[in-house]
Amino acid sequence: PVVPAREQNVPPEIRPALPSQPGSSEKSPQQPPSRVDRLAPPPDEHSLLTTAVRRLRTAHDPMSALAALDDYRVRFPSGGLAPEAGMLRAEALLQIGRKGDALAELDRLSLGQMPNSDERYVLRGELRAGVGRWREALADFDVVLRGHAGQSAEIGAPTDAKAHGRLERALWGRALARSRLGDDAGARADLQECLRRFPRGRFAPEAARLLGEHR
């Protein structure tokens, strides 16, 4: 293969959209619940997930956060915030080095229906590549790169540094996956594109070396 196996672990930026709790008025006549009201999570669900976020992001205690998420899963197995809880669980598991369990969480989620889906697809692709699931990894990287296929070469210098990093990781990851699947021409094309768009990027030296070896 053109590209040697290597694994990257770049934790996702996960920001669950926790809805605020609705207020009430004693004098207001009762009205039938709106569709939004019916879909809003109950206060206990909201509070429990907020506790998990605080433990994970503020207290930097992933084990305690996992305990809150375990409680959430038992009490609200089909809760309105279950996808956000799954992403938080994956983040906590990555922080304690349990990559396989984190990947299992990501495998269960419909990433395309969640905010910040590009980051999550790239992360899952990297984790899948890390355990040799090359074809599935390729599919994840393809989702991200197809979404930016119409952009010009200036994509290598976007104002959003995180978007810059995601696209570079997706290109490198797809080159790796294509190489492992026997598509050396596709891998070379991705390495060339990686150098063209990100000439001073984190993978540029290795991409240049590999292209030089396979001329």
Model-derived segments and their meaning:
Residues 79, 113-116, 151, 164, ...:
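Alpha-solenoid repeat scaffolds
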Residues 206-214:
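Short, low-complexity, Pro/Ser/Thr/Gly-rich segments in the mature regions of secreted, periplasmic
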Residues 1-86, 91, 95-98, 108-111, ...:
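Low-complexity, Pro/Ser/Thr
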Residues 145-146, 184-202, 212:
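TPR/TPR-like (Sel1-like) alpha-helical repeat modules
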